[in-house]
Amino acid sequence: EHCLNPSCMAACPSGAIYKRAEDGIVLVDQDRCRGWRQCITGCPYKKVYFNHKTGKAEKCTFCYPRLEAGIPTVCAETCVGRMRYIGIFLYDADRVTEAASVPDEKDLYEAQLSLMLDPHDPRVIEQARANGIPDAWVTAAQNSPVYKLAKEWKVALPLHPEYRTMPMVWYVPPLSPIVDLLKDQGHDAESSQNLFGAIEALRIPVEYLAELFTAGDTEVVTFVLKRLAAMRAYMRDITLGGEGNEEIANSVGMTGAQMYEMYRLMAIAKYNERYVIPRAHMEDAHNLEEMGCSLSVDGGPGMYGDAFNDMEGRPTPVSTSVYENSNKVSLFSWDGNSRPDGLFPNTTGKK
């Protein structure tokens, strides 16, 4: 989850888990890890696992070498449903402990949102520049799809905020069970009034989602589902050749333009709209993690040495320059047997 307040980092006796200052990614230092396994029990999301071959703890690295090159993570790149988005937040790191310490668990969601700074605010931009954040990162924050979904439109929610780890992977709750139920009962499943009534009447799905995303606060989940239902009804009128009903948008505190923008991002967004990833700046190259992909170490899930004998098990440097000089290959069109240029590192010095 790459939390703002990671419990695995606090639980590690060796101090092997750290949060990168440049992008907030939580990583495990394999040299310092001594296999205490306290991070495994300390992570409430069970995102840390123990590699019995190496005797080290491992976790999702968020494909940081790819991010440094401005390329999405592998899980996002290969998602057939195009359900994943990647963007950045500008947040107030000094207030993380304060936000995670609010007494009422139901206030944790709003407390976490309060940490997210408005990238369009001139004061935030000025302070970001003073702190050495490149303008390209500020621009990326302004165009971040995750910021729009989580903070601007408030339709994405954090997973189990009651753990007080301030997770930074956000989820849009599903509307489909309610739509399917209305359709099975013979009702108009696209009508905003029918959807609003069903959301309030079906307490079990709402309460279940509230336990997942809002520490049991059903009002927040109801608000999110109503916004999604309103977008569905608003766009149906436009699709059928009519004009968007502004009353539907206004009923959930949005405008027609915002409703259409949200629809576009969630339904037909292009590649560069779903993944807004600023590249690492070369002037900060000394801070980059110039090493092999963490999934391709001995004993790792990539099993680098066993999979590619001609590589002799040597880690391949994954950096901005490597991606710049390589060709893009579509995994969907790859036959799985050939070795097209750009898919594997060039170890012979020849194309």
Range-by-range predicted roles:
Residues E1-H2, P65:
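The substrate-binding groove and active-site-proximal loops of carbohydrate-active enzymes
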Residues E58-T61:
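Membrane-embedded catalytic interface detector for glycan/lipid assembly enzymes
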Residues K350-K351:
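Short acidic DE-rich linear segments
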Residues G81-T347:
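Long, compositionally biased charged/polar accessory segments in the mid-to-C-terminal portions
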Residues Y49, R66, V102-K106:
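A short linear boundary/processing microfeature
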Residues N5-R32, R37-G55, E68-R95, V146:
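Iron-sulfur cluster-binding cysteine motifs and their immediate structural context
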